[in-house]
Regions:
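Membrane-embedded alpha-helical bundles of multi-pass integral membrane proteins
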Residues: 1-277
Length: 277
């Protein structure tokens, strides 16, 4: 009961602050003259599927960084159901999304989820190595800028990558711990068949005993959820806000050919600069 109350306070506080930040951003955009971006809906949907969800541009740029970025993005999409479920379990311990029970579509989903978690952790390690050790030109620029930027801490990028890895790892620890301390729960044990990464995580946890696994699982649940909420609130303050806005930006993007000028509008409200004949 106490845990649910604390979780509710945390959830409302973090979500409330995020809503406040979002409102401030949207209130600024609301002052900009409107442009109709609800036209050509089929074309906008296609663009979103190809470039937003499909991440096509990242396969056309620098490699392997582009592919790695795409997998991190896809990992977040796949983890959306896991994050929602773990949030709900703060109030309803046995909650799962419709059709995502372990004996329904949840089993195959767990396999894909665990696979993406491991892939994303590997991608994060690769990206951290770029920031810390290799300093590629795309990140640091050419000399002398390269030498100057290489000396910067770049703490924001490293912090975000750490957040991402923490979300992935704590998800596996949470599920793996449950497999150890709930040996009589048929649904939890059935997850072993599908959630292969969590099952592997359960091995070292089991070696420490069920009490340790229980404590580790609970700690992982709190850390996972608090990092997600902290990440959510950090993004609007950072240059990585596009993590949230990327799909809307693609959907509402300008569809006219690059370089085409907007048609001039001449009416009584149009401001005229210079001499008008």
């Amino acid at each position: 009961m106490l845990s649910s109350i604390v979780w509710t306070i945390c959830f409302l506080g973090f979500v409330g602050f995020f809503a406040y930040q979002l409102w401030n951003r949207l209130s600024v955009l609301g002052k900009v003259p409107g442009t109709n971006r609800f036209d050509r809906i089929p074309e906008r949907i296609k663009t979103t599927l190809v470039y937003g969800l499909g991440q096509l541009k990242f396969f056309q740029g620098e490699q392997p960084a582009g592919i790695v970025h795409a997998f991190v993005f896809w990992g977040f999409l796949v983890l959306g159901a896991q994050v929602t479920t773990m949030f709900l379990q703060g109030w309803f311990p046995d909650a799962h999304l419709p059709l995502l029970g372990v004996h329904q579509l949840g089993g195959p989903y767990m396999f894909v989820r665990d696979t993406m978690e491991v892939i994303v952790v590997a991608c994060v390690l690769f990206l951290l190595a770029r920031w810390i050790f290799t300093h590629p030109t795309r990140l640091m620029g050419f000399k002398p800028a390269e030498e100057r930027l290489a000396g910067h801490p770049h703490w924001e990028a490293k912090l975000i990558l750490t957040f991402i890895a923490t979300i992935m790892i704590t998800g596996m620890v949470y599920d793996g711990g449950k497999m150890v301390y709930l040996p009589d729960d048929a649904d939890v044990q059935a997850e072993r068949t599908w959630a292969w990464a969590a099952n592997l995580m359960s091995i070292p946890l089991a070696a420490q005993g069920p009490d340790f696994a229980h404590a580790a699982s609970n700690a992982a649940w709190w850390l996972h959820n608090l990092v997600v909420l902290t990440f959510l609130n950090f993004l609007p303050l950072a240059k990585h806000f596009h993590v949230i806005t990327s799909l809307p930006n693609v959907f509402f993007s300008k569809l006219e050919p690059r370089g085409r000028l907007s048609k001039p509008v001449y009416d009584d409200t149009t401001e005229v600069f210079g001499k008008s004949l």
